């Protein structure tokens, strides 16, 4: 595990409980995100499960599950997995690094990767996307959400807890070229 991945994991482990409490119901206030997820569900059709990659406390997995979709969640942070399972006991969650997922080839019908790639260094984005492609079933659908721009924002403190997190912004044209 490289330092950037390790720092991301440690940082989210530190803030998992607070993050879960603050964001567990965020989908209620995000009609655009819900619409994107509904389109993912329709496009995936009978292909399942759909994975909430970088699931955090599982708010996206919960929304997908509420739409009648077989859903699972994967996150780098063990403490986030604990929170996700606590908040959503009916959904399966497991730990995984999107640069080296523990899941078998062709095992997911769809992926909702909402704002998780923002912690992947630019030079590793293609590797993460290849790994996502590896676990997608033929005809599977990938939905990626990210911040638009070129900057990298850094956070040393989050809710009075020490963290070491970079948030990378990407241009749609560069993301399209990687896909």
Would you name each region that the model predicts?
Residues 167-179:
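Short alpha-helix
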Residues 139-146:
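Conserved beta-strand signature within the Rossmann-like core of class I S-adenosyl-L-methionine
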Residues 109-124:
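A short SAM/SAH-binding and catalytic strip from SAM-dependent methyltransferases
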Residues 99-111:
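A short acidic, Gly/Pro-enriched loop at the edge of an enzyme's catalytic core
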Residues 1-45, 150:
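Conserved class I S-adenosyl-L-methionine
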Residues 148-166:
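Short, glycine-/aromatic-enriched active-site segment of Class I SAM-dependent methyltransferases
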Residues 49-53, 57-100:
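Class I SAM-dependent methyltransferase SAM/SAH-binding core
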């Amino acid at each position: 595990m490289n330092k950037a991945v390790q720092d991301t994991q440690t940082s989210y482990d530190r803030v998992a409980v607070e993050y879960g409490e603050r964001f567990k119901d965020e989908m209620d206030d995000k009609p655009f995100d819900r619409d994107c997820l509904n389109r993912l569900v329709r496009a995936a059709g009978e292909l399942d499960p759909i994975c909430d990659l970088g699931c955090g406390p599982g708010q996206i997995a919960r929304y997908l599950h509420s739409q009648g979709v077989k859903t699972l969640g994967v996150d780098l942070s063990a403490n986030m997995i604990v929170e996700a399972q606590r908040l959503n006991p009916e959904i399966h969650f497991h730990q995984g690094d999107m640069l080296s997922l523990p899941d078998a080839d062709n095992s997911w019908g769809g992926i909702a990767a909402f704002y998780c790639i923002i912690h992947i260094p630019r030079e590793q984005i293609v590797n993460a996307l290849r790994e996502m492609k590896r676990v997608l079933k033929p005809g599977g659908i990938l939905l990626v959400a990210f911040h638009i721009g070129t900057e990298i924002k850094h956070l040393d403190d989050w809710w009075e807890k020490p963290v070491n997190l970079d948030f990378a912004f990407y241009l749609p044209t560069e993301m399209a070229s990687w896909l």
